[in-house]
Amino acid sequence: MSAMVQIRNVPDELLHELKARAAAQRMSLSDFLLARLAEIAEEPALDDVLDRLAALPRRDLGASAAELVDEARSE
């Protein structure tokens, strides 16, 4: 089952740009926005990314992060 979503108070400039992008892809505004929302929903949530990063094994880089940054900046 699908649902209807309404977005209020969209600035005129933003609406114009979205309509132009939809037209450039030969899509209706509704289809264009639905495709973009689907892309957003496919992106991992920040909490999931952070959990995956936390689960990675720690590596000894032989220097602190600050030292590595300083070294890279001096090159």
From Swiss-Prot:
InterPro entries named among the record's database cross-references:
FitA-like_RHH, Ribbon_hlx_hlx
Transferase in keyword set: no
Question: Which biological processes are named by the entry's GO terms?
Answer: regulation of DNA-templated transcription
Tell me which UniProt keywords the record has, alphabetically. Answer: Toxin-antitoxin system
Question: Disulphide bridges in this chain?
Answer: none
Asked if the Swiss-Prot or TrEMBL record annotates the protein with the keyword Cytoplasm, the reply is: no
Free-text function comment from the UniProt entry: Putative antitoxin component of a possible type II toxin-antitoxin (TA) system. The cognate toxin is VapC12.
**Protein name per its UniProtKB record:** Putative antitoxin VapB12
Species the sequence originates in? Mycobacterium tuberculosis (strain ATCC 25618 / H37Rv)
Q: Which gene encodes it?
A: vapB12
